[in-house]
């Protein structure tokens, strides 16, 4: 398991509400909570930037973090991430924020401390461009969308 530096920015985190944790031994994501001042209604089509009360510093350029939606919120209530996926670079040290979007047809109340997203650490491979005049031939070539089959 990797070590991850974290700062608590909201004193309710770790006292009134648990720190981010893995729900099961096999979980890939740490739950992030809505550290709002009060329960907030998100109307259909609305977006809201929600603080998590936490900042992290990954420090290792070979790692990044992804902020991903919680499957139940999206499937049952239409609550997804406004930016679809949040990317946290290894050198970012600010508060983790979650952009929530209600793509459903009904208002949804986000309760203070509710689990609204998950944080997943992923490996990163940084690349540099090697400029060439032509590529070596491949079987696919420049075939794009739908090129490899109809399904």
UniProtKB/Swiss-Prot annotation:
What pathway is this protein said to act in by its record? Answer: Pyrimidine metabolism; dUMP biosynthesis; dUMP from dCTP (dUTP route): step 2/2
Q: Which residues form a coiled coil?
A: none
Residues given in the record as substrate binding sites = 70-72, 83, 87-89, 97
Highest rank taxon of the organism: Bacteria
Q: Which reaction does it catalyse?
A: dUTP + H2O = dUMP + diphosphate + H(+)
Q: Which GO terms describe its molecular function?
A: dUTP diphosphatase activity; magnesium ion binding
What the entry lists under Gene3D superfamilies is as follows: 2.70.40.10
Question: Required cofactors, per record?
Answer: Mg(2+)
Could you tell me which InterPro entries the record lists for this protein? dUTPase, dUTPase-like, dUTPase-like_sf, dUTPase_trimeric
Q: Which UniProt keywords apply?
A: Hydrolase, Magnesium, Metal-binding, Nucleotide metabolism
Q: What is its EC number?
A: 3.6.1.23
- Which Pfam family would be a valid example here? dUTPase
Give GO BP annotations, semicolon-separated.
dUMP biosynthetic process; dUTP catabolic process
What is this protein's function?
A: This enzyme is involved in nucleotide metabolism: it produces dUMP, the immediate precursor of thymidine nucleotides and it decreases the intracellular concentration of dUTP so that uracil cannot be incorporated into DNA.
In the record, the note on similarity to other proteins reads: Belongs to the dUTPase family.
Name of the molecule in the record? Deoxyuridine 5'-triphosphate nucleotidohydrolase
Organism this protein belongs to:
Pseudomonas paraeruginosa (strain DSM 24068 / PA7)
| Name of the gene this protein is made from | dut
């Amino acid at each position: 398991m990797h070590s991850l530096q974290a700062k608590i920015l909201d004193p309710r985190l770790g006292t009134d509400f648990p720190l981010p944790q893995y729900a099961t031994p096999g979980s890939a994501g740490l739950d992030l909570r809505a550290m709002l001042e009060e329960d907030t209604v998100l109307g259909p089509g609305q977006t809201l930037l929600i603080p998590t009360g936490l900042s992290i510093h990954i420090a290792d350029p070979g790692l990044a973090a992804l902020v991903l939606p919680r499957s139940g919120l999206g499937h049952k209530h239409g609550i997804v991430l406004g930016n679809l996926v949040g990317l946290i670079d290894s050198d970012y040290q600010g508060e983790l924020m979650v952009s929530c979007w209600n793509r459903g047809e009904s208002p949804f109340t986000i309760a203070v401390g509710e689990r609204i997203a998950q944080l997943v650490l992923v490996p990163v491979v940084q690349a540099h461009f090697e400029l060439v005049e032509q590529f070596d031939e491949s079987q696919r070539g420049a075939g794009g969308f739908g090129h490899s089959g109809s399904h």
